[in-house]
Amino acid sequence: MASQFCLPESPCLSPLKPLKPHFGDIQEGIYVAIQRSDKRIHLAVVTEINRENYWVTVEWVEKAVKKGKKIDLETILLLNPALDSAEHPMPPPPLSPLALAPSSAIRDQRTATKWVAMIPQKNQTASGDSLDVRVPSKPCLMKQKKSPCLWEIQKLQEQREKRRRLQQEIRARRALDVNTRNPNYEIMHMIEEYRRHLDSSKISVLEPPQEHRICVCVRKRPLNQRETTLKDLDIITVPSDNVVMVHESKQKVDLTRYLQNQTFCFDHAFDDKASNELVYQFTAQPLVESIFRKGMATCFAYGQTGSGKTYTMGGDFSGTAQDCSKGIYALVAQDVFLLLRNSTYEKLDLKVYGTFFEIYGGKVYDLLNWKKKLQVLEDGNQQIQVVGLQEKEVCCVEEVLNLVEIGNSCRTSRQTPVNAHSSRSHAVFQIILKSGRIMHGKFSLVDLAGNERGADTTKASRKRQLEGAEINKSLLALKECILALGQNKPHTPFRASKLTLVLRDSFIGQNSSTCMIATISPGMTSCENTLNTLRYANRVKKLNVDVRPYHRGHYPIGHEAPRMLKSHIGNSEMSLQRDEFIKIPYVQSEEQKEIEEVETLPTLLGKDTTISGKGSSQWLENIQERAGGVHHDIDFCIARSLSILEQKIDALTEIQKKLKLLLADLHVKSKVE
């Protein structure tokens, strides 16, 4: 669009003074065409010219409001090419007609100083009554240059982006330098490469998920401040919601380091970003409703000291204080009181009681009664009773948390090299539902003490070593009870420890259900403890992520026969098979008598073979029975094994003598012939 204005020359005004050539014919008081931010073009009066910064101030009246703005010189000349001086000619762009200015603009120009177009048009009159002012159209606007202010802004932005790129490069170089200075940089690089190429879709469980009386879950905690300071590596990967992988560092004979990736599969696996609410949703929450149906539920946290057991069960720590409102204790209590108000269970008229006690050094102490020593006895109905244990009635979640805080303040704890506030006892918090004085259901929440290796306590005091031994003994007994529960064995060795004895009603009975939360540390320095925890949990669940077929052997889950015994059993059974004696290739003769003599040998030895086979079977059963117990007698096992070996050696020696005599007779007969 273009606009043409005919502005009569005012006789009362003095002639315009020429400006400097680079400003062209722009003067104060003349009308120029300007472009608004909404792309509208109209006239405005020049009120000020800044020759130092090369900008012009213009004003106009719009809807009875006086407005103004600053415009750079180049923009003014692009919109008003007629104002450019002859000394600085500009090629005129293609023009198009614009709409005429409004009448208000024409009235305003009567009081303003007139301006004259420097390029006369062909239709200009001789008397100079009117002048044609052409405003360039869109092509001129497309070539519009940026103002100095915009140039400065763009320049600052480019400098800012350049600085940011340099800072990112510096940070990347620093991170690379830190990694290369790490003594385990090579292992860290191999772990990252393995995770980068890991395809979690190919990891699957051999056995389909089924409903079990026991649920085994694993939770990984993040690296703590101590491990980060020591530049420890995260060697635990959770590629899916039920698989945990451990990247163990190994070293070859030529000192070359490599990774041994071990895979474990469980019901659920949680990474270091999982919250307590998420863990509770898949572990303890499905068991809450069972206690309203006269069930006995147990949820316990197992793992190395400092792996996050107390954090999972109790909640967040702030120094030595613990926020119990975010742990499994509080979450279970919330659901219990929520179900208690449910119309289905409200008519049962149940009351909620809470108990809290610890098991330390094989003895039971009441944490709600100033650590009073308690006795564990069995009544006439063969029910285990903790004599003297206080049961306090609770009516809301706050009262439950109050009991937990009181008990945690009295619980036995010590400082260890791994954890400054390590629990040295098994804490058992029980939520009991009663109908009158009769127990309706019970939920036992167990925070186990951290298991320890003997190699980690060589420099510890004798008292602490005894603590660790007692802890490991009770954990072993707990594993055996869980194995018996998971395999539906007729006998559960709950008497092996005070821990399992107290939790007996949770291990026996048709309504018992158990959940295990194995907590692991991700650091490379805790690799051995992490593997022990995962193996413990894997023996409880016994699920493999393997391409090998699932095999059920003669030995119980988690137990294997010694290599020497297995090789001996295999060799003896193979050598005593009847078919092996029949297939002797070199015992041949044309005489029927010799053939019959050779063929009668297995018959003569059949009884010995049968006896030996029965002895092997009995031996295996004895070994299995002894290994299945918690307190098995090693001396007795060795003596029993030696006795069976002597019997087998005698039988094999007799067979050897008969074979040698037969071979000698065959050689003599062949020489005679």
Swiss-Prot record:
This protein's superkingdom? Eukaryota
Tell me where it resides.
Cytoplasm, Cytoskeleton, Microtubule organizing center, Centrosome; Cytoplasm, Cytoskeleton, Spindle; Chromosome, Centromere, Kinetochore
**A single cellular component GO annotation:** kinetochore
Q: Name one GO biological process term.
A: metaphase chromosome alignment
Give the Phosphothreonine positions (modified residues): T125
Query: Which tissues does it occur in?
Result: Highest level in lung. High level in ovary, moderate levels in heart, kidney, placenta, skeletal muscle and spleen (at protein level). Pancreas and spleen express a shorter isoform (at protein level).
Signal peptide as annotated in the record: none
- Per its record, how is this protein called by name? Kinesin-like protein KIF2B
